[in-house]
């Protein structure tokens, strides 16, 4: 293999490694254990994945954005409490029960989307109702600032 080919392979590999895909949890208690172990904060997102336009937009434009993903992979444990409405998308009863319990504690008013930044113990640091009115970079910067002030 010549130098040019090797360089191309290495660059492609580095590019692929630089884009991280977030692991989403659907059990808050499990997420708390991981957050404690890894010394991270928890970002809890309430969504209606098949009926809530702003929820879908939030996922596509911010939570799936490379800037957010890079930050979240290093600093956050991500939890999604989804409340789909279409019969074909219904969650198993056990998951619905878990999500209902999370909503009872953190989203009793049923706001969608609702994003909540939590400490590793589940203490609320900040809530965002609806779709953020800022860019992905500004959203990440706000979370960084909240984390810095919490420590």
Language-model-derived ranges and their functions:
Residues 38-52:
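Short active-site neighborhood of thiol/selenol oxidoreductases, capturing the structured segment around
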Residues 22-25, 68-97:
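Thiol-based oxidoreductase modules, predominantly thioredoxin-like and allied folds used
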Residues 55-71:
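Typically the conserved alpha-helix immediately C-terminal to a functionally engaged Cys/Sec
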Residues 26-42, 72:
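A short beta-strand-turn-helix
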Residues 52-55, 115:
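The canonical Cys-X-X-Cys-His
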Residues 38-42, 74-79, 111-113, 120-123:
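Loop/turn elements at helix/coil->beta-strand transitions in domains of secreted/extracellular proteins
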Residues 1-23:
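Bacterial Sec-dependent N-terminal signal peptides
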Residues 104-105, 109-150:
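Non-catalytic, surface beta->alpha helical segment in thiol-disulfide oxidoreductase systems
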